């Protein structure tokens, strides 16, 4: 798979990233290198490899799940640039 400059522009637009025209070639090369690496990973035979969730065998302590509000919503929302009704307010980015 190969990425062209039109695809770089589209990905940048979807990610809401401003990209100058003189950066397109470099980003195209970077994305193509990443995709080439991913394609190499897809070619590996991992049929005999056991799935794992951690590279170090660790057992995590279990605890009962309890729903709380964190007991400090004011402190949490104090860091928000904008809040309404106890929630973070963010700009709409999905069209």
From Swiss-Prot:
Gene Ontology MF: a single term? glutaminyl-tRNA synthase (glutamine-hydrolyzing) activity
> What broad class of enzyme is this?
ligase
Enzyme Commission number: 6.3.5.-
What SUPFAM superfamilies does the annotation carry? Glu-tRNAGln amidotransferase C subunit
Matching InterPro entries: Asp/Glu-ADT_sf_sub_c (IPR036113), GatC (IPR003837)
Q: Which Pfam families match?
A: GatC
> Has keyword Oxidoreductase?
no
Keyword S-adenosyl-L-methionine present in the record's keywords: the answer is: no
Signal peptide residues are none
What the entry lists under Gene3D superfamilies is as follows: Glu-tRNAGln amidotransferase C subunit, N-terminal domain (1.10.20.60)
Q: Which UniProt keywords apply?
A: ATP-binding, Ligase, Nucleotide-binding, Protein biosynthesis
Query: What biological-process GO terms show up in the record?
Result: glutaminyl-tRNAGln biosynthesis via transamidation; regulation of translational fidelity; translation
Which catalytic reaction applies to this protein? L-glutamyl-tRNA(Gln) + L-glutamine + ATP + H2O = L-glutaminyl-tRNA(Gln) + L-glutamate + ADP + phosphate + H(+); L-aspartyl-tRNA(Asn) + L-glutamine + ATP + H2O = L-asparaginyl-tRNA(Asn) + L-glutamate + ADP + phosphate + 2 H(+)
Quaternary structure, per UniProt, is: Heterotrimer of A, B and C subunits.
* Role: Allows the formation of correctly charged Asn-tRNA(Asn) or Gln-tRNA(Gln) through the transamidation of misacylated Asp-tRNA(Asn) or Glu-tRNA(Gln) in organisms which lack either or both of asparaginyl-tRNA or glutaminyl-tRNA synthetases. The reaction takes place in the presence of glutamine and ATP through an activated phospho-Asp-tRNA(Asn) or phospho-Glu-tRNA(Gln).
Which family is this sequence assigned to?
Answer: Belongs to the GatC family.
Protein name, as recorded: Aspartyl/glutamyl-tRNA(Asn/Gln) amidotransferase subunit C
Q: Which gene encodes it?
A: gatC
